[in-house]
């Protein structure tokens, strides 16, 4: 039965790839022979110039990622292995935050955490930051089932359901009261993250090898409780994430401490400044005023580490498996909702991260952060120019653009195979969907940085503003969005 399912999957994948290649050939055949005449020079120049920037950034990430994954990291891993027991921590704290996650997923998560606490062999405390009594009863029943040895302890922290940031802060303070020493480490684990076997032993040695690394994060795979496209969309995201993380790890500047599973020095998470940064992070915006961050605790923890002078790292062979629950049944609605949260978190941190300066961040990290700001426009330039050229000179230019997109996304998909993640025939289309819809969402969010909400529960940031300030924020955001988009299109109409 299992072999038949695998065969069916392979046949469907092959059919998908054949369909994709057939569409590319049809577009190529539809192109007129004289398409590249003198009228097309501005079109080719614009698409090519922006393409050089965008693809050079992607190629740089890919090359750096491969150098780290297949060259630098294996060398460092051998170096760690030679250190032997000298890399062992004095104590491991596995802190899990849970809120409104289905019981089956919660049981999977805590079972994996308890097993890892037992199997890692280090003195370990499992710290559970819980809101609901049902979760506490479930954890206690699993604890009784596994019956851990004496060196593995359980500490339950009950909190109000006021948000993940509060849950993390209460957990950090609970660990602080246990007075961990300088050699202790803390893993921060989300309530939908299942730990793979050996993840603790694979992550703890790096804090001894790199004395200035304050936090590190891990490779992610996912199980999606949704349809085929939603599943492929998440898997594509994790494959891209893996390469980008490897690239940034080459300079010890991984750009986020992923909330799903990251590990920190205990001296970091017990630092009052770090706790305050995670619990009550805020931004002073020139137009929107000061507002607190509701989501994006992973970005806050990263920024705090950078501000406090620490490095960040990535462990590609330490894997976790996340259980993804799409916030909507519709792929379009769910993906936009998730993009809104992710890109909002990214952009809220971006400007102040650049403010840390070149000396603290390094040249490459500064360029990457700058690229995150301009990519919302450069990602749309090719499509916009193609549409304008088609209106002015004929539909053939749109066909050229579609063929270019089809070929380049196919190449990008093949390159993703080097990440060790599987790829499917939907990946080229999803890559382009992410580029265009993602750019539109970034532009929308960029002018509304104060608008935040969780996807798992209907919780949004509430600001007690005067009626005029609310009106001004709303209409100034709309005006600036319309003005920026109009200028962008008008300039391209003049140039093409």
Curated annotation (Swiss-Prot):
GO terms for molecular function: hyaluronan synthase activity. It is found in: Cell membrane. Its EC number is 2.4.-.-. It is an enzyme of class 2 (transferase). The chain crosses the membrane at residues 9-31, 51-73, 383-405, 425-447, 471-493. GO terms for biological process: alginic acid biosynthetic process; extracellular matrix assembly; hyaluronan biosynthetic process. It is a multi-pass membrane protein. Keywords: Alginate biosynthesis, Cell membrane, Glycosyltransferase, Membrane, Transferase, Transmembrane, Transmembrane helix. Pathway: Glycan biosynthesis; alginate biosynthesis. GO terms for cellular component: plasma membrane. The keyword Transferase applies. Possibly a processive enzyme that polymerizes GDP-mannuronic acid. Belongs to the glycosyltransferase 2 family. This is Glycosyltransferase alg8. The gene is alg8.
